[in-house]
Amino acid sequence: MKDRIPIFSVAKNRVEMVERIELSDDEWREILDPEAFRVARKAGTEPPFTGKYHDLHDDGIYRCICCGTDLFDSETKFDSGTGWPSFYDVVSEHNIKLREDRSLGMVRCEVLCARCDAHLGHVFDDGPRPTGKRYCMNSAALKFIPRDQIG
């Protein structure tokens, strides 16, 4: 039996217990395009200013490209000047996991999807109020859903 974890659903406006998603690399390759696989499953980073969401200002929700978990609301998106979509908050702390990342000779805080462990990006303590956080995400790890299509 797969582990069940609490995940917040924006459409239902509540936390539900859902099964964790655990697939092999071959199974993820069948689902994702090559760039999404490289970024989300292999902790890659897209070049700045190249992702499809870094300059998107539409109203909606950003979900995990791998499993569809709600992650960020466009209301918390801001222009960080970095070239990656940046948010000052998550839709729910239930929906992400944080872990120390010591790659590239730096110590950073990696952000992962709580349901499927997809690499989303990193969080920094240089964001705007009210949180002071900057969730610096890869567009390739996200899927945007316009607010009127959330369901």
Swiss-Prot record:
- Free-text cofactor note: Binds 1 zinc ion per subunit. The zinc ion is important for the structural integrity of the protein.
Cystines in this chain: none
Return the EC number: 1.8.4.12
* Source organism: Methanothermobacter thermautotrophicus (strain ATCC 29096 / DSM 1053 / JCM 10044 / NBRC 100330 / Delta H) (Methanobacterium thermoautotrophicum)
Name of the coding gene: msrB
User: Which molecular function terms from Gene Ontology are attached?
Assistant: peptide-methionine (R)-S-oxide reductase activity; zinc ion binding
Per the record, GO CC terms? cytoplasm
For the ligand (Zn(2+)), the binding residues are C64, C67, C113, C116
What is the name of this protein? Peptide methionine sulfoxide reductase MsrB
NCBIfam families annotated for this entry?
peptide-methionine (R)-S-oxide reductase MsrB
